[in-house]
Amino acid sequence: DGGACVADSGVSRIKWPAIAAINDGNTKSLTYHVLIPGTFGPENTYVNTAGVRQYESDTNTGGRYIYTPQNNIDPSNPRTPNIARVDDDSNVKTPDVGLVKARTTSISETGNSATSQATIGELIDYTVTATLPNGTTFGTNAKITDTPNSATTQPLTGPATATLNGSPLPVGWSISTVGQTITVNIPDGYVVPPGSDHTVVISFQTRVADVSANVRGQSRTNQANISWTDSTARSRNSNQVSTTIVEPLISQAKSNNKSTNAQPNDIVTYTLVTSNSSASNVSIAHDTVIKDVVPVGVTLVDGGGNPLADGAIVPGTGGATWDAATRTITSAASPAININPGGNVTWTYQARVDSPAIAGSVFTNTANAKTTSINGSDANERTASSSTNTGYSANSSSTVRIGGSSVTKSVDPAWVTIGTPMTYKATVTIPQGLEFFNLTARDILPDSIDFDGYTGWSCISGCSGSNPAPTVQNYNPQVTSSVTNIGWDMGHLDPGAADRVIEFTYKAHVRDTHRSGGAPVLAGENIVNSVRSMSNTSNKFTFNPNSIPAQSG
C-alpha cells in the first residue's frame, strides 16, 4: 500500500501516503510484516501502535475540513487536535519462563499423606523445574534460587543437585548452597536455541526438625524464584508448596467396676483405654508403650481368679506382662502398638481385693502411655521425651474404695406427742474381713428432741469367741442450741470371720419448744435425726468421752 519505513524523532515508523477516500461505513486495511530481533529475552512485550495522523471531509459550503486526532501518532504534526484520538495497540510477547516446584514426603500412611503432610523427623524431597523457552536469550545475572523455610524448622540434609536437560550442569553453570539458600547461576547471555526448550531441574531434601516451632497444624511453605536482567530486571516466582505438619495426639482413660464399697476378695475389673484423636492433622501414634502400676492392696488374677506369677502375660491386655517387683503391667514390645487416628487400644483385666483389708482404704492405680512420631527407631523422631511433646504422652488413674461399716436406725413409737418417751435403735453392721481403726457411731438429734440417756448395746449377730464383739464406750452428750450429739466408740477391730451386727439403744422425748429460737413444736412436724458410722485407716486418736469425732462425708 505504499508504506515506507522512516526514522522520525528517533522512532522507527511506517508512513503511508494519503488514502484518497474511505466511503462511509467502509474500512481500509494496511498490511505489513515485521521481524522480531534475532536476540531477545523471555517475557518481553513489543508494543506496536498504529494511528491516523489526520483526515479530511467535504463541508456543506464547498470546502474541506481537516480533522486532527489528539495524542497524535505523528508528534511533528503542527495542527491543533480537534477530535478524539484515533489509534490502537497490538502487542507481541515472547514466551514466559516456566518455574514449577513440587515435593514428596518420605512417609505415606493413614493421617500422613505423602503429597501434602509430614510428621516430625520426616524427610521432604523437593524438585524445582525451570523451563527456559527456546529461541530466547538470557541477559545478565540470571539465576534460580530457593530458600526452603528455615534452617531451624526445615534444615537441608545435604547439598542440592541440578541438571540441565537431564545431564550435569555444563561449564559456565554453577550450583551453590549457602546456609539454607540454593542458587543455580546461568551464564550471562545464555542462548536457548530455537526448537526445544531447555529444562533445569534442582533437587534437594529437608527434614522436619524436632523443634518447638514445628507443631501439629503448622505449615512449612516454600517457593522458588528465577531472575535475570535484559532491558530491565525481571523475576518470576514458582508456585508455593505448603506441607502441613501432622502428629499423634494420644489420651488415656481408666475405670473400674468397684469404685465404691469394695469388699475383701471382690474381683475388680479394670478397663484402660489409650486413644489417638480423630481431629485434623493427627497421624499414627507409633511404637506406643503403655504401663499400668497396680497398687498394693489388690492382686492381679487370671480368668480363673488365680494370682498371676511374676512375668506372666496379663489376660485382656494383648500380651502385656506383669512385673511383680515394680507392680507394673507393661505392653509387649512386639508387635509394636501403632494407633491410627480415631483408634484406640483397650485393656480389660482383673484383680482381687486382698483379704483382710482396712476399712475405708483407697487403692489408686496410675497408668501412662508414651508414643513417637515415626515407626521404628529414628533418631530424628519426636517422642514423649522431646522438649516439645504435646500429644506424645497421656496419663490416667482409677480408684478402688474399700467399704466400711453401715448403720440403720429405727424408733419406737414412730408417732408421738410432746413428752412421749421414745426408744431409738442404731444398728451397725461390721463386714467380715475388714480391719477398723477408731470405729465410731455418731447420732445427731435435732433441737426438737431431748436426749434422755443411753440404755445399752449388744451384739445381735456374728459375734463369738473367735470373732469378738467390739469394746464399746459411750460419749457424753454434747448439747448445743441447735443439735444434740451422742455417740459410741468401738475402737480398733481386727478383721472378723463373719459380719458382726451391733445394736445401740437410747431414750429420748419430744420437746414442747425448739431449743433454738423457742418456737413451739407443732403437730405434724416430721422430726428427723441421723446416725452415721465412720472409721480411720489408722489410729488417729485416743478415746475421749467429751470429744466426739467430727462426722465426715
What are the residue ranges of the model-derived segments?
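Exported/extracytosolic protein signature
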Residues: 1-553
